[in-house]
Amino acid sequence: MASIFLNKKTIETNNFIFNDNRPKNIKIVDKIKSSTVEFFHSIQKHIQQVKVENNNNNNNNNNNSENNKYKRSQSEENINNYIQNHFNPPQPQKKRNILFIFQNLINSGNSNNNNSSNSSCNSTPSTSPSSTPRSTNSPRSTYSPRNNNNNFTESSSDNQQFDITFNMVVEKERVILTVKVPEVGLTKKILFDKVETIKDAILLVIEKLPPGCLDASEYNLFLPQKNQWCKIDSRFSKYQFKENQEIEFKKDSRGGVSHMLSNVGNLLTRPYRTIYIKLPEIVTVGTLPPLQINGQIGDLPSLNNSLNNSLNNISSSSSGGTGGGSGTTAAATGSSLSNSNSNSNLQNSQSANNSPIIHRRRTSSFSYDPNIHHSSLTHSNSNSNLISTNTSSIGNSAPSPTTLGSKPFSIPKLNLTENNLNNSSSTSSSPRNNGNEVIQSSSSTSSPRVNAPPPLEHKKSFLNIIGISPRGTNRERSSSTNSLNNSTSSLKSSNNNILQQQQQQQQHYDSAPTTPRNFGTFVRTQQLQNQQQQLQQQESIEAFDFEDDSTLGEVLNKICTRYQYIEKDLLEDYSLITKDGLWFVDRNKTITELGLKHMDEVEFKRMTQKVKVVFLNKEIVLNFNPSDTLKEINYKIIVHYLPSLIKLSRSNSILSSSSSSIFLNHQSSSSSNSSSSPSQSYRSSLSLEPLVISDLENSQILSNTPTITTVGNHQILNLQQQQNKQRSYSDASPLSFSKDYTSEISNHQQQNIENHINRRKNSISTNPLTNSGNIANNNNNNNNNKDKDDNNNNNNNNNNNNNNNNNNNNNNNNNNIASSTDTIQSNSSTGSLGSNNNIAFSIQQNRYPIPDNLVEFKDFKLHLSGTKNQNPNINQKFDMLLDERRTLSSFNFWNNIKLHFKNSSKSLHSDSKRVAPTLPFYLQIESVEQFSVSHILELEGTLLISDILKSFNRLLLNNENIKINDPLDEYGLFFNTVNNGNREGLSYGSSIYLDPYKTLSHYPMIEPLDKLMFKRTNTIFGVDPNTIVSKIDPITGFNIPCLLLDLKQKFIELDGFSIEGIFKTNNYYDLTFTEIIKEIENGTLLTSNNPNVDAIGIACFIKRWFSKLPKKICSLLDDETLLYASTQESTAEASLDSIPQPYRSLLLWLVRFLSEVSQSAYTNKCSAKILAIVIAPNLISISPNNNNNNKENNDHHHHHHHHHNSHHHRDNNNNNSNNNSSTTPTSSSVGKYTSLEKLHQCTLFLRNLIKLKLRENGFLPISTSSISISNSHNSSSFISMTGTSETSIHSSNSPISSSISRSPSLTDIVEE
């Protein structure tokens, strides 16, 4: 709704002032048949006639009141007739309102005629102070000028103003639009001021562009939101442009008659041919569109409605309503706006449900689940249209009606389909009849003869007028239609179908995607085999008209306009392929030279994938076939590239390179025997700069490579052409691989192999159970030491390894047969050898023979490593080993992904999933302080944060080298904003906690391979003491955390000093800890009387707090200092200076507290010795891997023996009721002894400090006599005076010697 303010000045000068913020005062009519401008022109014209008549009457000096009354009544009658004839208001009250306004305008014109002529035309009208806004309760209000409570006030001043509100959008005269010029690659904001027609707007845009860059006669304005062109001769205000609305300025392929005449002339005079091209769906790493489950709308990403805000910020649920400046008239906005509003309301009601929804992956324009029948997805026409049209075109970050007011959902992917990559294109699919046929609309980026005229623009096109029927691009494809159908039947297209599609189509997004995950692309249509049938029904084949002299590069550039939001270096990996598997690579050849005929069908498909391979501190940029498996790629790297890389490390010369193009022909492959020997370039580098190998046809590298190879069902023929081209770094485009570069075994080699096996058959036992073992033993004798691996070692046990593959053990150096896990295992090969044919067949299956000089690299494979912010303090870094059975496209890698080619048998790695995730997403999770481990995880993109936590916890629990003492429920994932660059929506200098109940889509700042920190989620345990709120302890004078002081005070209130076994008891419950944490966070620990909080729980809480410190207090002392501090009290006091603050203050506070507890040892049975034994394990970290070098030197049997003993020892410790420590040292015997020795020293150190504090308090006389801390419960006092020396405490007769000194019972003082 828009408010229009009129006064006498604006009417006389034809200046209408629009203000959307004014209150809506007077509602005259609901619908106006004529346009707004014509309406006001009519009002102005009629009022001008009335004013002329009144002026004539005034000049005649006719002051007769009766005459004036008659003329006034006559003017009212004329106005009444005018309104009745032109507007025909349905209600009498509206007629009276119009008459009232007209009469006041006439009266104001009569009384102020002389003053109005001298007034300024640009004065701004002021609002009457007595006006009040209209009540919103009643739908319609009547007005009368009798009091100040009405919304209209009559005045005789020049600035009198009247508010008229219409149910129609009125566009401003001044509007700023964002104009995109795709041909120039320019986006500018242009102010359109007093522009009357579209032609004037075009001339204004031409003035703002660089001079001479575009021709105004060939360009027009295009509205991507409505997918329509503007009429050149139409008024500019007709299209109701909004502020900062985005429009496109490009060549008009169907705008006017002149354009169509020129196009028809070109078609009649210049040779052309039409090519049908299948356009794939390209998905870019980012966010995924909304999902539909059983016809319902799932959780959708809620985006900010403001275009000025960041396109990456995801906001919470917002209202679906529009502001005061939006219009609702169907004639102005079309039916698409009303459809989108209804669908948006449906989504808002659906998003109110907070229950988690399992999100499924979309494979086409509608969501597909193999477990759900297809009919359930499209049972609702409104919902199916919404999902099928809008969700397939998601990719821009600007909001749309279907994404406002919804919850974030579960996928961090950005779907840039072919439908929305170009805003001028529109593709929609709607089920017809039984759902087998799908209509797809055409794109406006193709030729003008192909695209049908837009709806609501002109009913008849020029081609229909002159009798030429345009070829449409909408094909009716049945469900049984295969890709690239051989049929070239005519395409069915009609304006009615297009009009119906345009009415159902949702508004496209306005701006290009700018999410930080925009790294690369992959073809979604090649991921899962069970989705191929659904994808075949959604084929997008469009017709393009090209001139005969058009080159392949021009053809690809025209196709790439559909994917204009993807970087061009990514689109360079795409090319055309025919139905017969013919790739077109030479972009300088014309379509005539390439053999493309009229009405041919080709496919626009990805041909190569750029990968950075890191080997021996060198980077090379290679291009691989996305359909190749990792096993094939690993073999190609070893055979074709490792020789050059090894030579690079030995050569200092930089040679010139030559590149070659590939022309892959299926038909000529059977008869072609071409050979080539271009020179291969080698390039040395002492740094980590990427090396680009642009030529593969080297006689030295590809000497064993056949000319004819196979890619799937297509054969490949390599035709080398010399081209002198300079290539450098990532701008180079290395040659792509074929699927199989293997050489068949020649007849001579096959004969030698058969003769060799026949000679050895006589030495093989006839027992099939021992055949594999004998073959393995014989082959192991012939192999070199460097060729022995785990497969050969495992074959030493003949009776236990009958299932091993014999072909893997036939490593004969004379015949150059390398082991391979790709051979076929069968009964004939695992059992008796059988005939020679079986042997020959098994050997031929080994398609990846490695030369002798490269056998040492047979275990080298590709790994995915963390490349961002490497932490040198990580002890165990697990890279992800890429599964060799998966294809490169299944990993969803972006261009220039960095993969490390290294040994997979010795390095730490975690295997990738055998079954490829439907939406893979890669994260690096690191835990520094607690476990010092880092993992690269390949996760399903639909997982919650809690699922990612479970996956990482499973890796930690399965790692035998990691000792976990704490429950993993206390840990969570954090995103560190300090080391992750400048990204929008981040508060730097802190870590963002990832909510376990949310998905990755809630955190759009997380990019693939970002590092997440695995650390504690609470603010009490495991926190650095420097970051905790502290205050001065009045007793000790140290700066102590407030929570420790509150816990001690609560302990005193609960009379914890008199409870027996107060620090020895560990039978606390999780409920107690939960209640204590809750009261500490709320600050009610000292004031509440919670029955679940007792003194034993407080004591256990203090022990847990000291055990969870990031740095254990006694671990800060080196071994020599700790040994020195454990000897006597004076050395213990002197060693305190070696402990840094604030840990020294914490230790002294704890010693003071324990000394106070030990003073009541008669009642609580906790002497200084017992307290030292109980608390010491919490002050020192005991690692089970103190002697890893000794463990590695032990053989397997010896290691297993000690491993069994350690488990038996752990069971004994758990069953011992006298042990009260919190750590169990389990390792080899040497490591166990070292850990217990340090624990013993820590116990003596703590006991000496407690004794020293007791001496300071006056409980012990300062003399040469010593103290013996008794463990007997029958003694009347915990202090016994003896005349022996201080060293008598370690004698064998001492009651504590069996518990503290080194003896076989040292484990009695150790407890978890």
Curated annotation (Swiss-Prot):
Residue ranges of domain Rho-GAP in the record: 1030-1212
One GO cellular component term: cytoplasm
Gene3D superfamilies, A to Z: Phosphatidylinositol 3-kinase Catalytic Subunit, Chain A, domain 1, Rho GTPase activation protein
UniProt-annotated stretches for the region Disordered: 52-74, 111-158, 314-519, 762-831, 1185-1230, 1282-1312
A GO molecular-function annotation: GTPase activator activity
GO biological process, one term: regulation of Rac protein signal transduction
Protein name: Rho GTPase-activating protein gacG
